[in-house]
Amino acid sequence: MTAQLIDGNALSRQLRTEVAQRAALLRARGITPGLAVVLVGDNPASQVYVRNKVKACEDNGLHSVLERYPAEMSEADLLARVEALNNDPAIHGILVQLPLPAHIDAQKVIEAISPAKDVDGFHVGSAGALMVGQPGFWPCTPYGCMKMLESIGYDLRGKHAVVIGRSNIVGKPMALMLLQKNATVTICHSATADLKAMTLQADVIVAAVGKRNVLRADMVKPGAVVIDVGMNRNEEGKLCGDVDFDGVKEVAGYITPVPGGVGPMTITMLLVNTLEAAERG
């Protein structure tokens, strides 16, 4: 068996077409959805991510503002900028690119963002809304994973889903989203005694730890759906995920590639969240 690919690029194009159409309807009413992206410092990876987010906005009818600041920027000054953006009616979503310089408390900055503009879904208010099933902004990466499962018509009810990783950005919210769809969810992490025993029971596996080959073919039951959130580089410098793709694709029923899987979906769901923030207005 060779797994079917869940193509994140193709799904992203489809969803971005819908975003552009909805953005055009808003613009016809005099509302241009606006995203502010704040970058502190000169982390090369962050600069690439930020450029991609700004370009995605421009390509799909959203207004974007990129604010760049030196790594020496004080926490107080950054908090003041966030507050100014909170009060700017032309801005519907605010994204502060992580990681921040060590002298700035990232969680404090995240909490300073108005929950109504928290399109990254990292605010405790957004996390709480997800926990109790209330409307709010879902973190973009797990939200994208859910859209990928939806795209293949996968019914999670009664299925066993294993999430490898427990970060606030992916692992924990991913587990809650799967739970909302009536999956039975197991979260695995660095202290899990026997990861293979857990994953072999799984109908769905989401790998999100940032470690190459954390999931191998002998750890996957035939026909399972494998979502690879990881973004790593191999010895040749090529992008790869957390999953041993070549091995696992011979066992799984569905699998996401890296690159071209979850990555483009993350930015697409940021656009969706920003659009929804503007629609809620």
Curated annotation (Swiss-Prot):
Q: Which InterPro entries match?
A: Aminoacid_DH-like_N_sf, NAD(P)-bd_dom_sf, THF_DH/CycHdrlase, THF_DH/CycHdrlase_cat_dom, THF_DH/CycHdrlase_CS, THF_DH/CycHdrlase_NAD-bd_dom
The record's section on CDD domains has: NAD_bind_m-THF_DH_Cyclohyd (cd01080)
Q: Which Gene3D superfamilies match?
A: Leucine Dehydrogenase, chain A, domain 1, NAD(P)-binding Rossmann-like Domain
According to UniProt, this protein's pathway is:
One-carbon metabolism; tetrahydrofolate interconversion
Catalytic activity line of the entry: (6R)-5,10-methylene-5,6,7,8-tetrahydrofolate + NADP(+) = (6R)-5,10-methenyltetrahydrofolate + NADPH; (6R)-5,10-methenyltetrahydrofolate + H2O = (6R)-10-formyltetrahydrofolate + H(+)
What does this protein do, in the record's words?
Answer: Catalyzes the oxidation of 5,10-methylenetetrahydrofolate to 5,10-methenyltetrahydrofolate and then the hydrolysis of 5,10-methenyltetrahydrofolate to 10-formyltetrahydrofolate.
Which NCBIfam families does this one have?
A: PRK10792.1 (NF008058), PRK14186.1 (NF010783), PRK14189.1 (NF010786)
**Stated name of the protein:** Bifunctional protein FolD
Q: Which gene encodes it?
A: folD
